[in-house]
Amino acid sequence: MKKYIALLISLFISIMGIAQPLSTPLDYLTAMNKAHQTLNYEQLYLFQKGDDVTSLRYRHAYYNGHEYAQLLHLDAIREEMILRENVVGYFGDYQPFSLKTPYILDDFPTVVYSDFSQLDGYAFLDNGKMRVADRIARVIRIVPRDDFRYQYMLWIDEENYLLLQSHLLDRDNNVLEQFRTIQSVVGDQLLYIVEPIRTLILPTLLQTKIHSELKPLEWQLKWVPRGFKQVASGQQNLSEMLAQDGQIESRLYSDGLFSFTVYLLQNKGISFQDQFWREGKTSVYSQTIGDKDVIIVGEIPLASARHIVQEIEFSSQGEKQ
């Protein structure tokens, strides 16, 4: 009898130890986020922004609570980025440099790093399964509940939850950015990248020169798309960026999935009227208001940028009519 009970207990424990299947789109998105930060893996993929297509190799290792990664461009001039403990080094046909950042954000779908539980105003939809790169993937759509943000379609590996493919779409379902895996490998053999990265001398760390507000900015946004919140603001002398005098003011906003920055600077005599440019998911919109130029750079549609500019409010001291 004791043997029988022990067998039942053992069976119960083994069943409880089996990972429960994911049941909701949010489960898949959360698992994807964790997988990309904690698995040891390599992905060969194509990354398209507008008409520009690049082939790349991304290697990632997680060791002793730290992430190590290498992103290598496989075409034309060799260019690579190295991640080591919240610092990314850039190497290519330019002066090497490093930036303080926890992720490699260039030519890689930043959607994998989002905290999906904190997103506001999006619907997560399950679109079934599909085969990608000889893997079975779960198709998840991230759809905004308005027309002022972009949407994502994601193909997530059913076994290890790595992202295999993604489409960033505008309101008309045009693909603005595409990530498509050709080959995906997961395993502890990728830990071999840790030691070379740990011993690598990274280039000089560039310090950002945007200063926190020396005085309150004399303007504010009365409207932003749903879910966006200001995460930073500051002032910078143009002489630090360009051979010009004057100051540029900025406010950075994010909803946890997309971001944009609004810049305000003194007009130099050339008026900008509803000028818009876009490459992939990044848009640039400029408008002159009085003697000020307003420039918006970020991952939002033209309709959103226009609405934001229309709702800028200046204080009485800084009003530009």
Role assignments for model-derived ranges:
Residues A133-T199:
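Gly/Pro-enriched, hydrophobic low-complexity segments
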Residues I201-I289, A303:
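Short, solvent-exposed recognition patches
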Residues K2, I15-H66, A76, K129, ...:
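N-terminal leader/targeting segments and the immediate start of mature chains
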Residues V53-R57, F148-Y152, L164, L176-Q178, ...:
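Short, surface-exposed coil-to-beta transition loops
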Residues A6-I15:
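Bacterial N-terminal signal peptides
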Residues T38-E42, G65-Q70, D134-R141, L162-Q165, ...:
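Short, hydrophobic/aromatic-rich segments at coil-to-beta transitions
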Residues S55-P109, L168-R180:
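An acidic-aromatic
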Residues Y103-Y152:
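Intrinsically disordered, low-complexity linker/loop segments enriched in Gly/Pro
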